[in-house]
């Protein structure tokens, strides 16, 4: 868990902002959301495979768009 030390003469809002930023960098909220409900290993693999396919399709579409001639 991210820990911050409140500096001297630092307002609460600034310290809270620093804490939120450190939580975001650590990926804490995403981890909590992922672990909120149990997900079967087969479902995890299926979701990851689908996201990989989507990523590849997106990259291929970008490359094809770059290689097409506009005239």
Swiss-Prot record:
Residues 43-71 are annotated as: Disordered. GO terms for cellular component: ribonucleoprotein complex; ribosome. Residues 60-71 have a biased composition (Basic and acidic residues). GO terms for biological process: translation. Transmembrane segments: none annotated. It comes from the Bacteria. GO terms for molecular function: structural constituent of ribosome. Residues 43-59 have a biased composition (Basic residues). Keywords: Ribonucleoprotein, Ribosomal protein. Belongs to the bacterial ribosomal protein bS21 family. This is Small ribosomal subunit protein bS21. It comes from Haemophilus ducreyi (strain 35000HP / ATCC 700724).
């Amino acid at each position: 868990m991210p820990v911050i030390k409140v500096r001297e003469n630092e307002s609460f809002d600034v310290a809270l902002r620093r804490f939120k930023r450190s939580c975001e960098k650590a990926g804490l909220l995403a981890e909590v959301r992922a672990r909120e409900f149990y997900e079967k290993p087969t479902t995890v693999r299926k979701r990851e495979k689908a996201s990989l396919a989507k990523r590849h399709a997106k990259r291929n579409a970008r490359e094809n768009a770059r290689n097409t001639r506009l005239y």
